[in-house]
């Protein structure tokens, strides 16, 4: 289960586990200057953003880079990449908060130098109660298709409850 956390979104809003409760969300780790897997991951997640309404789903991309603590950088990244901030939260925080969040909630690892190794292709599906329900390789279209199917089930379950 995702533990309590408090991070800051690209619009300066506080994003917590409580603010994400009552609907499923998709989470991943990234940084704005990444030229490796992040562009592919972002493109695939854009398809998820387009498939659902912001009332049904939240997307959470957690920056692991210190330089992304400048919210104007996250805001610019959001704008350039067509990220709808009411649905897709790009969040940051101090390094310790992000490290604890990644380690405690998502089972991230530390590398041999003790640095956070959370920047992977993994996308996490979290249900409305904060339980991780699936892990997907966000760079693969087939995995994103499975994520979309699983999300549809969770959204339907959530609509039946509310």
Where do the model's predicted regions map?
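N-terminal "domain-start" segment that seeds a small globular fold
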Residues: 1-18, 43
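Short loop/turn microsegments at loop-to-beta-strand junctions
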Residues: 2-3, 25, 120-122
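Short active-site neighborhood of thiol/selenol oxidoreductases, capturing the structured segment around
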Residues: 15-45, 60
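Sec/Tat-exported extracytoplasmic proteins
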Residues: 24, 49-53, 81, 102-109, ...
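Structural microenvironment flanking redox-active thiols in thiol-disulfide oxidoreductases
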Residues: 40-101
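Structural micro-motif
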Residues: 88, 99, 106-124
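Thiol-/selenol-based redox modules, centered on thioredoxin-like
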Residues: 113-162
């Amino acid at each position: 289960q995702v533990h309590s956390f408090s991070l800051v979104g690209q619009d300066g809003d506080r994003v917590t586990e409580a603010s994400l409760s009552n609907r499923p969300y998709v989470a991943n780790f990234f940084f704005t200057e990444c030229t490796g897997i992040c562009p592919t991951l972002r493109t695939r997640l854009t398809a998820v953003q387009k498939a659902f309404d912001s009332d049904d789903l939240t997307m959470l991309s957690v920056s692991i880079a210190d330089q992304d603590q400048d919210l104007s950088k996250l805001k610019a990244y959001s704008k350039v990449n067509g990220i709808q901030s009411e649905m897709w939260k790009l969040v940051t925080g101090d390094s310790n908060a992000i490290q604890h969040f990644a380690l405690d909630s998502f089972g991230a690892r530390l590398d041999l130098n003790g640095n956070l190794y959370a920047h992977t292709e993994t996308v996490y599906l979290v249900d409305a109660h904060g339980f991780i329900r699936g892990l997907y390789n966000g760079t693969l279209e087939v995995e994103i298709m499975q994520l979309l199917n699983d999300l549809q089930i969770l959204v339907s379950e959530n609509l039946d409850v509310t």
